[in-house]
Amino acid sequence: MSIKSKEDLLNKQAEVNEQIKSYTCRVLVCSGTGCIASGAQKIYDEMSILCERIDGVTVEMQKDVPHVGVIKTGCQGLCELGPLMRIEPYDYQYVHVQPEDCKEIVERTILEGKPVERLFYRDNDTVCPHPDDIPFLNQQTRIVLENCGKIDAESIEEYIAVGGYQALAKVMGSMSPQEVIDEVTKSGLRGRGGAGFPAGKKWSQVARQAEKTRYVVCNGDEGDPGAFMDGSVMEGDPYKMIEGMTIAAYAVGAENGYIYVRAEYPLSVKRLRMAIEQAEKYGLLGDNILNSGVNFHLHINRGAGAFVCGEGSALTASIEGNRGMPRVKPPRTVEKGLWGKPTVLNNVETYANVPKIILQGADWFRTIGTEGSPGTKTFSLTGSIENTGLIEVPMGTTLRHIIYDIGGGLKSGAAFKGVQIGGPSGGCLILDQLDAPLDFDSVKKLDAIMGSGGLVVMDENTCMVEVARFFMNFTQRESCGKCVQCREGTKRMLEILERIVDGKGEMSDLDELEELANMVQNMALCGLGKSAPLPVISTLKRFRDEYEEHICDKKCRAKVCTALRQFHINPEFCIGCGKCAKNCPAGAISGKIKHPYHIDNDICIKCGACKDNCNFDAVYVEA
């Protein structure tokens, strides 16, 4: 049925909500990429089979006898504890669910309404039955992620049931394009993909171009290592992003839009395609949207994994079928973007904020976050931290609150060393900066960038020189090679960093590193090139003593750099089993059975196989 008016939309919402209410129980199985990798599909299949066997129970949504629904949702947040399951109406949150647990869940929870307590999350000694009991979840403010983990990720009906497309109906029915732009501008919404350019200003610049053929493009090319925020939105609630893009198209007069998604996100592509087809079926996308005379067609373009295609002009070049390479600006994308036409280019999270701004108003949005950075920000929290996963917090939240209150602190009580923010183009922040607010302007003052929102927490066992080398290796390989500064500058910086971690560095290397980093930062063609040296700049500034130790003392205090460590066997712990010698690929270990063994460090290749295979902690490392 095509929805032609706000009244039709409200009727559909009421109809679907009645269907949902008729369920005695809903089983929400997290079916984001992380949980699927942990076996969530098996959980879904097993629960579906078991629920179908119950008399009068159906897995599909039906009008006649719907009692139990088994639903695939998007990411429920606690990625490390998957597979995850939530049971309504009891609001039980189960973690680490296995196929063999499903029968007990059906018998105890679905049929009797009782919890399976061993599947609850535990915060130290505290049992947390409900999501609101879990510190990782109850200290978040969810706008972009509000539906992720709560609705069927493959059902536009469920999105409509929670108020989906009402913002679009409001726009089409009672707002002019300029009024939409004014509201987004007033909200202070800034692009969530990197530098934080005001979204309303960008839309306004496109709308006033003389050229009438315009495009709306979504950057879903999330290439930062350890970042999965945009992918989770596209997997868990693609409809919100699509609604935001449709509103943007109405505001700037565009009839075609493109979603640029990494080929490494097959689940996102699948669910986006489903969402587009469903929206077209209901008249919420395509020709004559909501009987308004407005047309907007949405297309998906799959990227080939090039990190540089996250840069605007490289992304549009890739959509056009050309090699993804940044170009000189001006003209900027708002003037000459896709196929030389004015183009609105924002990322997934930016568009996903728009429907709520339209419905609740710009003033409401500005009550969240900071004066200069209103709203919330999603982050992927990873690294040496107790609770890794997907979070959304108000702009201005401190790193200390995120790491210790939401993330649960560092694993095994290790000492905090630093946090990498902004991915390979970001910077490392230290203990003294944990209380700095996380917003665009504050982070920039700390020689870092917000980026797409990756947060990698590092403890005392992390070598910061190796961290800089790792990220420089990534950016050097991903450099498009168009400008000499980035192509050659990153290569030379990588060569110096590799010398230092190999124990062959000299003190003059540090001055050369700084000179090269400043040159690339000031002279590279595109934003990615300009930010590529940030990991080097920030680690040199805050961990210079580690660089000097590597060079002068030939020592890696974290015992990470292979060339600067030696393996030894403690004769007091060694029982002479010979397992280390059997697993040494270099034949560097000698000894007799039932007598302590010995490692010849002149032969040792420092692979660590001996330490990994020793069951008695007899092998130790010296830096």
List each language-model region with its residue ranges.
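Conserved phosphate/anionic-ligand binding catalytic regions in large, soluble enzymes, centered on
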Residues: 31-39, 80, 184-206, 305-317, ...
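Iron-sulfur cluster-binding cysteine motifs and their immediate structural context
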Residues: 81-87, 485-491, 579-598, 609-623
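Hydrophobic alpha-helical positions that pack around
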Residues: 140, 269-395, 407
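C-terminal accessory/binding modules appended to enzymatic or scaffolding proteins
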Residues: 375-387, 393-395, 399, 557-601, ...
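Gly-rich Lys/Arg/Thr-decorated short loops/hinges at beta-loop-alpha junctions or inter-strand turns
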Residues: 150-166, 218-230, 333-338, 380-385, ...
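Flexible inter-domain linker/hinge segments
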Residues: 120-186, 340, 346-361
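Short amphipathic, charge-patterned alpha-helical segments
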Residues: 244-246, 396-411
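Ferredoxin-type iron-sulfur electron-transfer modules in oxidoreductases and energy-metabolism complexes
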Residues: 2-25, 41-70, 83, 88-121, ...
